């Protein structure tokens, strides 16, 4: 009788674990939705950067004071947003329940933001050097 109960419990455990398809590798839905939102914002940021690059190229051809002020203001806004995201990522990285996959995603998002901020500051310095 004990053998039958043990076999039944083991079979039930295997069925509940293996029969479920995971749509993502996150421990809970909140983490999945948060990272999905971060990735959406990164895509929007990339499009904004392409637009900003077009503005910089146009500014180099025909520099005006208004264009320079607009570009510098947009760069300052993007850098401030990156700083805000860095704070959120730092708080998330302090959690003790993250697995390796989640830690890797957070670290990569933070490093990407650092690289982007560094490049934006270089571009901003280059734009500020152009005489109007």
Swiss-Prot record:
GO terms for biological process: protein complex oligomerization. InterPro entries: Mite_allergen_group-5/21, Mite_allergen_group-5/21_sf. Keywords: Allergen. Residues 25-53, 102-132 are annotated as: Immunodominant conformational IgE-binding epitope. Disulfide bonds: none annotated. Non-allergenic peptides identified from the mapped major conformational IgE epitope-containing areas could be used for the engineering of house dust mite allergy vaccine. GO terms for molecular function: protein homodimerization activity. Belongs to the mite group 5 allergen family. Monomer. Trimer of homodimers. Oligomerizes in a concentration-dependent manner. This is Mite allergen Der p 5.
């Amino acid at each position: 009788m004990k053998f039958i109960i043990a076999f039944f419990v083991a079979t039930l455990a295997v069925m509940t674990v293996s029969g479920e398809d995971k749509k993502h590798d996150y421990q809970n839905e909140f983490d999945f939705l948060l990272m999905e939102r971060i990735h959406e914002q990164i895509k929007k940021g990339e499009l904004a950067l392409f637009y900003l690059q077009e503005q910089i190229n146009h500014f180099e051809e025909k520099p005006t004071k208004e264009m320079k002020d607009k570009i510098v203001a947009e760069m300052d806004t993007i850098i401030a947003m990156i700083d805000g995201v860095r704070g959120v990522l730092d708080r998330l990285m302090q959690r003790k329940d993250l697995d390796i996959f989640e830690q890797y995603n957070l670290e990569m998002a933070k490093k990407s933001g650092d690289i982007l901020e560094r490049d934006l500051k270089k571009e901003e310095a280059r734009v500020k050097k152009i005489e109007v």
